[in-house]
Regions:
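Surface-exposed edge beta-strand/loop patches
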Residues: 2-66, 148-149, 155-156, 165-245
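Low-complexity, acidic Ser/Thr/Pro/Gly-rich terminal tails and inter-domain linkers that flank the onset
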Residues: 69-109
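Hydrophobic core residues within well-ordered beta-strands of beta-rich domains
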Residues: 87, 114-116, 183
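Primarily extracytoplasmic ectodomains and periplasmic/lumenal surface modules that are beta-strand-rich
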Residues: 96-100, 121-129, 194-196
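Short, solvent-exposed beta-strand/turn "edge" segments of beta-rich domains on protein surfaces
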Residues: 97-115, 128-134, 174-178
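A short beta-strand signature
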Residues: 109-126, 139-142
Length: 245
């Protein structure tokens, strides 16, 4: 199962840029009319700007209200459309534990640590014919873990530092990839022991996506989550975790 955000990325990005351009030109006409004390130019510029902003806003909100929340099962892929190619994210493993780190210096959780292993893949089947084999650095990402009560948890710096002491490498979701390449990244969250129905949200961390029609970050749009239910446990020889309390 796969989901993509935003759908028809080249179209909606061009629509956004076109709306910005027309609005900017209209405002220049408005300013020209004000400077020349011309009511005609002022009305044309102001009316055009208001029409474009209102029309774009209605379309953006309409598409958002028609969206529905998605929770992808383990193994499902969430794609981010980078105009001429797609970067996919999928949960490949989960581990819950009360402490992380080497036996001589473990970091204990106030509740419990949840380690989520995410696979990041540059899907070579989604590139345009003219793209080539050059590396792509994904846009900035925001990551949170949510539970059944709507509580959100950011990655735990203490937990990730403890895991880093065991694994000896960190990496990030922003590592550049060539078409067909992939890597796995362990994300560590600290949650209360009563947290249930956990699901992972990975989304873009760019402010302009709020204004992109059909993007999950846009106003009133529903999110696409990666579910953790039935995820395989992370192999301990790869990521040795302390037993949970």
């Amino acid at each position: 199962m796969t989901e993509t955000t935003p759908h028809l990325a080249p179209v909606v990005v061009l629509l956004f840029l076109g709306a910005v351009f027309v609005t900017a030109v209209s405002l220049l006409v408005l300013l020209y009319g004000a400077a020349r004390r011309s009511r005609l130019y002022a009305r044309i510029g102001g009316g055009a700007a208001a029409t474009v902003v209102a029309g774009y806003g209605l379309l953006l909100c309409g598409v958002s209200l028609a969206s529905s929340e998605q929770v992808l099962p383990v193994g499902g892929w969430k794609y981010f459309c980078e105009i001429d190619c797609h970067i996919g994210y999928s949960v490949s493993g989960v581990e819950t534990t009360g402490a992380l780190g080497a036996e001589t210096g473990q970091t204990s959780a106030r509740g419990q640590f949840v380690v989520v292993r995410v696979k990041v893949w540059f899907d070579e089947h989604t590139i345009s014919r003219n793209r080539g084999d050059g590396p792509l650095t994904p846009n900035a990402r925001r990551v949170v873990l949510e539970d059944a009560n709507g509580r959100a948890y950011a990655p735990s710096p203490e937990g990730e530092a403890a895991l880093l002491g065991v694994k000896g490498e960190a990496g990030s979701l922003g590592e550049p990839l060539r078409p067909g390449q992939s890597f796995e990244k362990d994300l560590v969250f600290e949650v209360p022991k009563d947290a249930s129905a956990l699901r992972l949200l990975i989304t873009e961390d760019d402010p302009e996506t709020v204004l992109i029609i059909g993007h999950e970050n846009s106003l009133l749009h529903r999110k696409i989550y990666l579910g953790l239910d039935s995820a395989p446990r992370i192999a301990r020889e790869i990521s040795p975790l302390a037993p949970g309390h």
